[in-house]
Amino acid sequence: DLAGFVEPEQGSGVDFCGRYPADYLVKNAPVKLPVWHVVGGVDALTAEDLTGGEPKDGYPVLLADWIRTDGLKCLKVKLRGTDAAWDHDRLVRVGRMGLAGGMRWMSADFNCTVGRPEYVNEILDKLLRDEPEIYARLLYVEQPFAYELEHEMLDVRSVSARKPLFLDESAHDWEFVR
């Protein structure tokens, strides 16, 4: 059962004894799922971002063209996690372009590079204050902590109070995900 892997918040009244992953899965899964388009950290958003070395393979290069061509509704934004001004600007630029193109959701992927939760909190709080529609469309925050959780434990409860968290490659040892 999950009790050997997940520890509930003290005083939450949650008990994982006798509970299994299947207990938390949707019984009648949807037939269709939205596709998430990854906006890489060096991907060109506008013509000003072009370097001249872009592929000439017939596929879009600029984000607005991708959105229009493929009807993108969900954008995963890769961030640096070490340059708050750049990360915030990237989220705003992608968010505005996405909203103009009918985006439903976006996510912020900090790529296991954040050294302190306040870094993410400050970006999220600024989005909430200055770009509330972009903040509202930010479905979750991915990897707001180091890859090696064992060696760089962070208390990210303050981040999860703002937005749900998603971890993938950091979750390679559940002993440290508590």
Predicted regions and their residues:
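Generic hydrophobic/aromatic pocket-lining and core-packing "Φ" positions
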Residues: 63-64, 153, 176-177
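Generic hydrophobic alpha-helical scaffold/packing signal
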Residues: 124, 142, 154-157
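Short, surface-exposed basic-aromatic patches at helix termini and helix-loop junctions that form
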Residues: 92-100, 155-161, 178
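N-terminal capping/lid subdomain adjacent to the active-site entrance of alpha/beta enzymes
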Residues: 1-132
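Catalytic beta/alpha-barrel core
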Residues: 75-83, 107-112, 135-149, 162-173, ...
